[in-house]
Amino acid sequence: MQIYLDTANLDEIRTAASWGVLSGVTTNPSLMAKEKGADFKATIQEIASLVDGPISAEATSLDADGMVREGREFATWHPNVVVKVPSTTEGLKAVSRLARDGIRCNVTLCFNAVQALMAARAGAFIISPFVGRVDDVGVDGMSLIREIVQIYRAHNISTLVLAASIRHPRHIVEAALAGADIATCPFKVLEQSMRHPLTDIGIERFLADWKAWQQGR
């Protein structure tokens, strides 16, 4: 399973990219809005220079014509740009048109398996089920991932399943076990995933033993 970073913060991207684990980046209007004074195009292009993989940039139009217009513009910014559109009927129209142009789309805000099936049939490159938000309404978000993966495999659908709205490191594990192709994570979750008290204790013990051995020679 690939790991993407869910952020528009360039410092976070630079740091995570230095770990050698990133295969892509996802952004959205809310994440962009956190970066005060940032230019959308320049930010996406800078991200593409830092991470060699799909970079999702989201259209803000609600109608298919607007999404297509934005998507075609985004696609000129960098070959790795993937256009994000919502799981709506207008989004499906946009995906089918953009796909015919050879422009890859990430269909976002997916909350049921039928939306995922429709997106795939329209030509989506990626489908993004929001597991954390599904959990929030009392339903198991990972069951949605499992349903989509099962449907796609049964019907030889090549659309990639991206687990979004990741809230904690366990979500990453569960997404991998459920068969997701990608998990996109906030920076703090990636950091948390590499922290464990036993790792810290082990390092301290190894260093203490090494120091004692060196002093006793």
Swiss-Prot record:
Subcellular location(s) per record: Cytoplasm
Classification via CDD domains: Transaldolase_FSA
Catalytic reaction list: D-sedoheptulose 7-phosphate + D-glyceraldehyde 3-phosphate = D-erythrose 4-phosphate + beta-D-fructose 6-phosphate
Primary location class: cytoplasm
Enzyme class label: transferase
Keyword Cytoplasm: yes
TM ranges: none
Catalytic residues of the enzyme: K84
GO aspect biological process, one term: carbohydrate metabolic process
Keywords: Cytoplasm, Pentose shunt, Schiff base, Transferase
Keyword S-adenosyl-L-methionine: no
Function: Transaldolase is important for the balance of metabolites in the pentose-phosphate pathway.
Family: Belongs to the transaldolase family. Type 3B subfamily.
Descriptive protein name: Probable transaldolase
Gene designation per UniProt: tal
